[in-house]
């Protein structure tokens, strides 16, 4: 605050009287006066006020100097003003009244009071300034001089300690005017805490430190315009805070020294350092505020505040203290002081924590102890007073015997000079309690021990507790304050006694120093000599006590302490322990540890203190670690009366640790259980004892306290080792702790009313009481059911959390059991785990009514994850189904695309054939439109005819989906085969556009190089032809080249009755060949086109198992499912079983060798077929054309005798059925007829062998034909003009070939019969294979065979040959030479070395066929054509186009080309690598390579037809077709079907040549891998005039 302004000159015009009368008017009229200030206010002297200066509050600051540097002019004006105004009567103050306003409690504030000296002549000396209230404080002022007309300032500090308005007076003691008063006021308020409540302010004490020195850092002053000052402060603590704070802050002189580093910005660096320092001190005020313990803190604190009233910037950089003790804690943060403020800034805080360690045992230490008092200086030592040593004065209080409430006070003077005690008094609060006795006046006390006075308690028989001081004034300027606490305590007799405790004093015993007794320091190692040192010191101390006890006068002893003397002798009964100072505040204290669990520890603390004024060394250890514990125990028993019998001298369960929890320091464990402490005078320390029980039970021991003051001391310890023990449900843990759940039947009866989907779950809840029956508190941390926390195996602990149980307390737990009703007795384990890692195990026992388990098990809901599991399962199954659908869709698309590609190729082939010239191959579509139309046009309806009449027209083939049939084995065929129909009469309307023409006389030029056509082509037995000799079919095996009848004839015969007659072409060309009577021509260009299509045949990937036990290895292992790979639509064309042929051969009449005789035998049975051959009279003019073609080189037709089944087939025109056997996949390769340039009368077919395998494919693959050709066409070839040939093919289905039409209709639409090739789907197109031709050098002579000798060839089922269609050489124009041309080459080279090509499929010729020879003209046989066999043949695969017709009727004139050894192949054929068109025997390298010189053994043998296979039995059950004929015998069919009855001149030869039909069916197995279901298709159902009967056992006439 700035100083007061000077009065303006205008003010002197006022009159002095007006100023004296109206001060208020003067303030108003004086415009230049300071607002709110009282200028020139006079304060009259107060003579009744005595100047006082309290030494307690005499802490000094550097006095603020008066403003004496006023200029002369201002002084003259002020003096004149003062003369006029006051006339030397007093001082003027500004402001007139000092009001501090509102201030928080404990927060100091300061304001400046200015005082003016109005006198112009005299100066005013201010001796002191003081206040009447403790809330206002003024720094000490000593003899401050205010010059005349000068001014000075005083800093008034307001520190409110209570709430409300505070008003007081400030007294200024002057030398000339006396004491002047000045009014000050303020308002105190509490500080609001964060919680909204006002905090209670503890007692605050105002302290003013003194600035001792100010040092300048030269480096800082030289470099910058600021100065770094080191300010050292000293503060002497007055007696109010002496005992609370002195132990922390003061050294021996009771002075707190601090050093503060400040940075001051100098405005004028030219000034001297002393001037700047004085300016700083004038504007800087430093105060301390000491506070007692508050409710929130147990620590006493001193806060340091600074007020800066100048304009320079001051930065407080550091504050530190000089105390050497570690108990002083300083909190400081650097701060920039604000300028020109009235509030102080707190910069540091000091906390003393040393009393906290003692506070815990202070109350205990106040009892039963009479220490010596130590003097505390009651007034600060100011300059001019000598420094006093507090240890120079010692006091002791003596209790009077037999007198309660009376004490004597002794004084020990250690000064070198005497001290005069002027007066003794007590505080006014305790004047009515304590009385001073026996003090006569000032006492001169020379060095020594003196009794100075007595104290007496004025009250009796009243329990009191008083804390007060006794003050002694001396001649040295010091006042000794003796703090005392007087409290009531019961005596041994039970009366109320009083004891006095001195807090600042010392004991009269002092231990020996190191110099006097070095042996004690050496005994700290606890060697065997330790007891010797302790016993010697203890005896010496005890003897001295005896001498001192009998002393009468005050004298010095060897101990160096003056002992007061009693007026009379003490009693002998007084124990030594009463006289001996104790290091333990409670001598009889015993640390009693409560029950402690084993392996657990418990800690308790006790306090040790130093009762003397000298440092004391202590060694604490358990008695068991002492070298001689028994000797130490006897000494303690002697001194303190310890009970030896209860002490365990060897236990190690007690250990020592050092700790002071009030300091917040972690406990420090002792090494080996021993502690070494050093206690300063009156210092206390806490020591912890750790009890770790090793066994159950109570144990007692001692803690020894070795010291250099009283030699030895002790404290008793006692502990109890216990165990945790629980009861649950009134049962102890273990095997007997069974907790039973009783489940009554009434509870489980609710199962009847519950639903499984209901949310209510049946459960049983039971409460159990958990009791702590042990002495230890137990904390249960977890409850487990068989190792699972809180729940498991249907049990669940409700409210499962940690809980604690004190001794003899209990708690209830609830356990819920949810049964799954799988067992009537459930036993589980309940485990309670405690914090001490102990486990208490109990058994949970649940019994359920056994008879209610099934009832309740139905209503138990599934687990929580069950619904999610099923949802997940359904999801994945749906995904799998979707994937399957997608895969099937893609596969179907692929099949459709392949089918469309095949149709496109077939359409292209068909268009090519039709555009060029009539050919002998017809595509699928052309077959649909031509072949079928041909049948419909030339075959009259047979409706209404009787059973014994021949059908008029050739019926249409019955269709069935062939994709369901897959050839699996070469085993027993259980299918009912349809037999093809030969056209009996041809109408005049020739359908040239819709039918394929016969092949040209000259085969198409062969392509060079072999092409990988159908892999593995099978041999199939040829049908038994009517009119052939039975001897011929006995053993004669037909070579493949022999089977190669003209492709046109064979295809026409197959296409009429088979679904494969659609001529389904995969890779090769296909031809529907019509009877010989129809005039069709084949161009060579079309043949070349067909050849290109035949070559890219596919190889099957999967080879099905062959179940033929007697077949050749090639047939057994290499039979594949070829149809699935060579045709996109996976269709098969079955081949008719050869059993029909065998059966029919037995019934065929012997034909004459002449062609006429053959045609006359119109009704001769060739096979058990169901259709009669039309008469010769019904033939068309095409017959003549066919005869003309025959003369031109075509193969003659053989007229078969088929009069046996005429009566049964009068309504139906049966088509020859091409059906494969489900036991084996046998394919017969029928080579295409090589039309030679022979004369027209030559009708003999030349049998020959391909000599060069490399030229195999040159046979004109374009002439490759489809196997399922209409067998009616084949019949047309066997009929002569004007003759009616009848040919029958036997069915092996077990039904009679003469089954009535009614039975056929009964089975319509059922699953009944095995489907045949004729029942396949009309859209199915048979595969074509490359044509076969013989090498040019292998032609057979024209006289090899007789034209009149019928030939019966029986091909065994074991003739299996994997044929290759890759290369089939054929001459372009020249006719095929005869057979004997190249036999040697074929034998040497081998027709097809195994392994040269891809794995070829076996070709098994399983049946037999018969051919009637009518013409003697030689003819080249076409490549072997597929003949209906008793096995399933994949017509879409390997045999595509190779066997275009089932029947290969041969007209042979020379039998020399058929050697006996070459015609019998019971063991199958080898696998030739490139040439598969020839019959190869396993035993002979070349089957047909015999020289032509072999004598002819062919004769006209009657075809003896044995009874048909199960002719009188026919299954009408739908399941009979699914599992085969259940009446089929397990015997070999062929053993009875091929009986040979030689009737011709060749009979003997044929018996040798013929081969008995090998056993084909190993046994009946209805569960064969493949079953061909006879499912009626839409074609048969829609067309009521469908020509082919739907009877599964239907057989057409051949």
From Swiss-Prot:
It is a single-pass type I membrane protein. Coiled coil: none annotated. Residues 41-868 are extracellular. It is found in: Membrane. This is Transmembrane protein 131-like. Gene3D superfamilies: Immunoglobulins (2.60.40.10). The keyword Transmembrane helix applies. Residues 951-966, 1125-1134 have a biased composition (Polar residues). GO terms for cellular component: plasma membrane. GO terms for biological process: negative regulation of canonical Wnt signaling pathway. Keywords: Glycoprotein, Membrane, Phosphoprotein, Signal, Transmembrane, Transmembrane helix. The lineage of its organism: Eukaryota, Metazoa, Chordata, Craniata, Vertebrata. Residues 890-1598 are cytoplasmic. The modification Phosphoserine is found at residue 1112. Glycans are attached at residues 343, 438, 592, 648, 708, 845. Residues 1146-1172 have a biased composition (Basic and acidic residues). The chain crosses the membrane at residues 869-889. Belongs to the TMEM131 family. It comes from Bos taurus. Residues 943-973, 1097-1134, 1146-1181, 1254-1341 are annotated as: Disordered. Residues 1-40 form the signal peptide.
């Amino acid at each position: 605050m700035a100083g007061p302004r000077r009065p303006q000159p205008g003010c002197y015009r006022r009159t002095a009287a007006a100023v004296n009368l109206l001060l208020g008017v003067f303030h108003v009229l004086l415009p230049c006066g300071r607002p709110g200030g009282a200028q020139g206010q006079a304060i009259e002297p107060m003579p009744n006020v005595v100047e006082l200066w309290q030494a307690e509050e005499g802490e000094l600051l550097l006095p603020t100097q008066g403003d004496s540097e006023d200029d002369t002019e201002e002084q003259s004006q002020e003096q004149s003003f003062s003369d006029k105004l006051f006339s030397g009567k007093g001082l003027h103050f500004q402001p007139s009244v000092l009001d501090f306003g509102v201030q928080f409690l404990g927060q100091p504030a300061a304001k400046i009071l200015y005082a003016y000296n109005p006198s112009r002549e005299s100066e005013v000396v201010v001796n002191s300034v003081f206040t009447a209230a403790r809330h206002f404080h003024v720094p000490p002022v000593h003899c401050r001089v205010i010059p005349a007309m000068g001014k000075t300032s005083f800093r008034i500090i307001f520190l409110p300690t209570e709430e409300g308005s505070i008003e007081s007076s400030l007294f200024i003691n002057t030398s000339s005017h006396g004491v002047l008063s000045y009014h000050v006021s303020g308002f105190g308020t509490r500080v609001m805490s964060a919680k909204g409540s006002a905090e209670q302010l503890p007692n605050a004490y105002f302290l003013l430190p003194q600035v001792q020195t100010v040092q300048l850092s030269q480096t800082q002053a030289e470099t910058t315009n600021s100065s770094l000052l080191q300010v050292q402060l000293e503060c002497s603590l007055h007696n109010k805070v002496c005992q609370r704070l002195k132990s922390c802050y003061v050294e021996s002189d009771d002075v707190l020294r601090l050093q503060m580093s400040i940075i001051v910005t100098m405005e004028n660096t030219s000034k001297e350092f002393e001037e700047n320092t004085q300016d700083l001190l004038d504007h800087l005020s430093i105060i301390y505020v000491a506070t007692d313990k508050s409710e929130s803190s147990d620590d006493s604190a001193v806060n340091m505040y600074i007020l800066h009233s100048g304009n320079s910037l001051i930065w407080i950089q550091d504050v530190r203290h000089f105390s050497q003790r570690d108990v002083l804690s300083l909190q400081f943060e650097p701060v920039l002081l604000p300028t020109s403020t009235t509030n102080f800034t707190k910069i540091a805080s000091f906390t003393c924590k040393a009393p906290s360690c003692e506070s815990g045992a202070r109350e205990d230490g106040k009892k039963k102890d009479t220490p010596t008092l130590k003097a505390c200086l009651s007034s600060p030592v100011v300059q001019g007073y000598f420094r006093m040593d507090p240890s120079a004065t010692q006091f002791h209080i003596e209790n009077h015997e037999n007198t309660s409430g009376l004490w004597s006070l002794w004084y020990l003077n250690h000064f070198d000079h005497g001290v005069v005690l002027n007066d003794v008094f007590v505080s006014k609060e305790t004047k009515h309690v304590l009385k001073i006795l026996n003090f006569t006046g000032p006492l001169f006390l020379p060095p020594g021990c003196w009794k100075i006075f007595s104290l007496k308690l004025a009250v009796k028989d009243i329990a009191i507790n008083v804390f007060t001081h006794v003050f002694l004034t001396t001649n040295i300027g010091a006042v000794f304050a003796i703090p005392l606490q007087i409290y009531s305590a019961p005596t041994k007799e039970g009366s109320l006694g009083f004891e006095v405790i001195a807090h600042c004093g010392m004991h009269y015993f002092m231990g020996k120093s190191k110099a006097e007794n070095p042996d004690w320091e050496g005994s700290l190692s606890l060697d065997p000599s330790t007891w010797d040192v302790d016993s010697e010191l203890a005896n010496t101390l005890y003897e001295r006590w005896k001498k001192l006890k009998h002393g009468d006068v005050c004298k010095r002893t060897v101990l160096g302490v003056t002992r007061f003397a009693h007026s009379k002798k003490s009693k002998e009964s007084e124990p030594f322990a009463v006289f001996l100072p104790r290091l333990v505040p409670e001598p009889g204290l015993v640390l009693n540890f409560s029950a402690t669990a084993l392996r657990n520890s418990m800690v308790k603390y006790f306090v040790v203190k130093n009762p003397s004024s000298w440092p004391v060394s202590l060694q604490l250890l358990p008695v068991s670690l002492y070298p001689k514990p028994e000797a130490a125990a006897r000494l303690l028993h002697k001194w303190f009366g310890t009970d030896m019998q209860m002490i365990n001298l060897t236990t190690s369960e007690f250990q020592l640790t050092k700790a002071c929890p009030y300091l917040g320091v972690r406990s420090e464990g002792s090494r080996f259980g021993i502690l070494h402490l050093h206690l300063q005078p009156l210092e206390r320390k806490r020591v912890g004892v750790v009890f770790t029980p090793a066994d159950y039970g109570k144990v007692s021991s001692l803690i020894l306290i070795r010291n250099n003051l009283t030699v030895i001391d002790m404290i008793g310890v006692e502990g109890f080792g216990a165990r945790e023990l629980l009861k649950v449900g009134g049962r102890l843990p273990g095997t007997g702790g069974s907790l039973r759940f009783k489940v009554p039947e009434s509870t489980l009866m609710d199962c009847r009313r519950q639903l499984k989907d209901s949310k209510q779950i049946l459960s049983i809840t039971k409460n159990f009481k958990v009791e702590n029956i042990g002495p230890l508190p137990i904390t249960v941390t977890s409850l487990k059911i068989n190792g699972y926390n809180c729940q498991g195996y249907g049990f669940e602990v409700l409210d499962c959390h940690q809980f604690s149980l004190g001794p003899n307390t209990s708690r209830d737990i609830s356990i819920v059991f949810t049964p799954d009703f799988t067992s009537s007795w459930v036993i589980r384990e309940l485990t309670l785990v405690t914090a001490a890692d102990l486990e208490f195990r109990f058994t949970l026992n649940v019994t359920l009514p056994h008879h209610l388990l099934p009832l309740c098990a139905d209503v138990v809901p599934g687990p929580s994850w069950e619904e999610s599991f099923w949802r997940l399962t359904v999801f994945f199954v749906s995904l799998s189904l979707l994937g399957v659908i997608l895969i099937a869709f893609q596969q179907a698309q692929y099949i459709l695309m392949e089918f469309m590609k095949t149709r496109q190729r077939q359409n292209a082939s068909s268009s090519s054939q039709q555009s060029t010239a009539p050919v002998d191959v017809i595509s699928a579509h052309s077959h649909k439109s031509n072949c079928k139309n041909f049948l419909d046009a030339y075959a009259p309806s047979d409706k209404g005819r009787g059973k014994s009449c021949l059908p008029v027209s050739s019926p249409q083939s019955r269709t069935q989906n062939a994709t369901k049939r897959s050839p699996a084995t070469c085993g027993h065929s259980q299918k009912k085969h349809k037999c093809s129909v030969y056209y009996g009469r041809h109408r005049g309307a020739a359908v040239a556009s819709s039918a394929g023409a016969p092949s040209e006389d000259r085969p198409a030029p062969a392509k060079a190089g072999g092409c990988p056509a159908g892999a593995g082509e099978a041999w199939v037995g040829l049908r038994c032809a009517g009119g052939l000799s039975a001897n011929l079919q006995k053993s004669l095996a037909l070579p493949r080249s022999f089977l190669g009848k003209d492709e046109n004839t064979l295809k026409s015969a197959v296409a009429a009755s088979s679904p494969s007659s659609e001529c389904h072409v995969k890779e090769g060309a296909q031809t529907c060949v019509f009877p010989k009577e129809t005039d069709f021509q084949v161009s060579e260009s079309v043949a070349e086109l067909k050849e290109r299509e035949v070559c890219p045949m596919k190889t099957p990937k999967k080879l099905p198992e062959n179940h033929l036990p007697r077949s050749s290895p090639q047939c057994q292992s290499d039979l594949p499912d070829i149809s699935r790979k060579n045709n996109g639509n996976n269709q098969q064309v079955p081949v008719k079983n050869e059993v029909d042929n065998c059966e029919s051969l037995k019934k065929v009449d012997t034909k004459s060798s002449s062609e006429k005789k053959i045609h006359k035998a119109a009704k001769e049975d060739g096979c058990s077929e169901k259709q009669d051959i039309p008469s010769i009279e019904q033939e068309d003019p095409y017959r003549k054309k066919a005869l003309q073609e025959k003369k031109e080189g075509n193969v003659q037709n053989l007229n078969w005798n088929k009069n046996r089944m005429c009566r049964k087939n009068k309504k139906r025109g049966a088509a020859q059925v091409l059906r494969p056997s489900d036991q084996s996949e046998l394919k017969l390769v029928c080579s295409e007829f090589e039309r030679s340039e022979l004369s027209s009368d030559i009708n003999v077919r030349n049998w020959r062998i391909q000599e060069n395998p490399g030229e195999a494919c040159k046979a004109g693959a374009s002439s490759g034909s489809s196997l399922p050709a209409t067998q009616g066409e084949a019949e047309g070839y066997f009929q002569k003009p004007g003759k009616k040939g009848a040919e029958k093919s036997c069915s092996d289905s077990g039904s009679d070939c003469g089954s009535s039409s009614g039975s056929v209709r009964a089975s319509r639409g059922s699953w009944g019969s095995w489907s045949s090739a004729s029942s396949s789907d009309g859209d199915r197109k048979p595969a074509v294979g490359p044509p076969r031709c013989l090498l040019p050098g292998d032609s057979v002579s024209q006289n090899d065979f007789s034209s009149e000798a019928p030939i019966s060839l029986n091909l065994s089922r074991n003739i299996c040959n994997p044929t290759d269609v890759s290369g089939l050489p054929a001459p372009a124009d020249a006719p095929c030479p005869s057979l004997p041309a190249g036999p040697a080459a074929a034998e040497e080279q081998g027709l097809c070395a195994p392994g040269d090509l891809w794995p070829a499929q076996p070709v098994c010729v399983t049946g037999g066929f018969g051919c009637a020879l009518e013409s003697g003209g030689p003819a080249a046989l076409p490549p072997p054509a597929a003949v209906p066999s008793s096995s399933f043949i994949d017509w879409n695969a390997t045999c595509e186009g190779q066997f275009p017709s089932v029947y290969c009727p041969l007209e042979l004139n020379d039998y020399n080309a058929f050697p006996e050894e070459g015609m019998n192949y019971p063991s199958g054929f080898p696998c030739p690598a490139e040439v598969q068109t020839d019959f190869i025997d396993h035993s002979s390298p070349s089957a047909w390579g015999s020289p032509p010189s072999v004598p002819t053994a062919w004769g006209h043998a009657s075809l003896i037809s044995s009874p048909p296979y199960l002719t009188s039995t026919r299954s009408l059950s739908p399941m009979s077709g699914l599992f085969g004929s259940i009446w089929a015998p397990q015997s070999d069919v062929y053993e009875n079907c091929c009986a040979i009855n030689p009737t011709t001149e060749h009979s003997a030869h044929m018996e040798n040549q013929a081969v008995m039909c090998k056993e084909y069916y190993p046994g009946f197995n209805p569960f064969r891998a493949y079953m061909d279901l006879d499912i009626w298709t839409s074609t048969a159902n829609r067309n009521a005039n469908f020509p082919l009967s739907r009877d599964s056992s239907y057989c057409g006439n051949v």
